[in-house]
């Protein structure tokens, strides 16, 4: 995950343009649509729900009921739009903090609590050839210098947060947008035509140009006003849309699709519990699975059955390896037992 985030956030121009499109439109469709696929768990049995949430139906419903009381700040047994928005802000902040901490843990190789330019370069260079690293080195340096607010040559956790979310810093936001335009706006008229987009559009992993049909589909996604051009405002609207942030809750979609436009009362919430369980309201189930990670007092973190199985397999493999190592050691010991004066 760390490498993907770095590539999306620190590479510039077409790479950012492409990866953001993939995240919003194809890679995580379920994360921007609350009622797709298995989001509705109400038709599943105990074992199926446990596979998804690590809890059987009654256990999941109990946590979802407790969640209602956390969101219902005034304890009137009804969740208002304002309370949903407050909950959404809390989720976004918690998810963002966890993301920043994870990035820090991966990149901060000397574990001093800061990220140096060398550490950032090393992390960025993983799995990239020298030519790609050199190509993006200047852009990486620019970003480092912009977010290094106290100019001490290293990034604190708050400064890394700016690097991960350019929307939080106007100078970095402007840099991202200008680089997208610089790459795609061939004739430098301040907007991107379809022909320019096709000419400069390529697959980020192979460098192969996309076919015209796919390029048109991608272009139309950004061309919000359908005037045949992508301008700066449209880039901002899509690339920096708060609705696409991790933890963002589409309040209207939740109210209409799950609660059918009705007031979100305590009884209705519990009635819809298994439809709520893996939507944006719960960070797609993570709040129910891992409440301690969100500092929520609704239960202990679970271990999903699949993760437990993998852990057992790893333990078995480790045990096998230990036995093999022991056998090899015994063989070696038999081949040459040291004399007393060699010890």
UniProtKB/Swiss-Prot annotation:
PANTHER family in UniProt: CALCIUM-BINDING PROTEIN, RETICULOCALBIN
Q: What is this protein called?
A: Endoplasmic reticulum-resident calcium binding protein
Does Glycosyltransferase appear among the keywords?
no
User: Localized where?
Assistant: Endoplasmic reticulum
Which residues does the UniProt record annotate as the domain EF-hand?
A: 59-94, 95-130, 135-170, 172-207, 210-245
Function, as annotated, reads:
Calcium-binding protein. Required for schizont to ring transition. Required for the breakdown of the parasitophorous vacuole membrane during egress. Required for the proteolytic maturation of apical membrane antigen 1 (AMA-1) during egress. Required for the proteolytic maturation of subtilisin-like protease 1 (SUB1) during egress. Required for the proteolytic maturation of plasmepsin X (PMX) during egress.
Region Disordered, as annotated, extends over 313-343
Keywords in UniProt for this one? Answer: Calcium, Endoplasmic reticulum, Signal
